[in-house]
Amino acid sequence: VRRDGHLGYALPDQVRGAPSHRLAAVFRDWVRSIEPAANLVVIKTPPGSAHLVGVVLDQSEMPEIAGTICGDDTIFVACRGSREAEIVSSRLQAAMSGKLQ
């Protein structure tokens, strides 16, 4: 980025509040399975795709989600409690099946 006549690095703008249609599209294309486990939701993706899905989850700003951890093909979604994990799991299952509103 050029600023004040000098070239330098800049962080990308933070995109917040991913629209539900974007979340649904990413989940339809990249998610293989979703499973609640206590206060976690475990999401499986094809190899190398977990980070892509994790970014969209982080941008979704769901209040039930405390945070995400992404590996190569697995995402752990930490929820605020087991009830919240069930809510998030149901919402993400709906996104994966194209029924998210």
Where are these regions (language model features)?
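A short, conserved structural fragment
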Residues: 1-2
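Minor-groove-contacting beta-hairpin "wing" of winged helix-turn-helix DNA-binding domains
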Residues: 5-12
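Non-DNA-binding regulatory cores of transcription-related proteins
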Residues: 16-95
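Generic C-terminal helix-cap and adjacent flexible tail
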Residues: 96-101
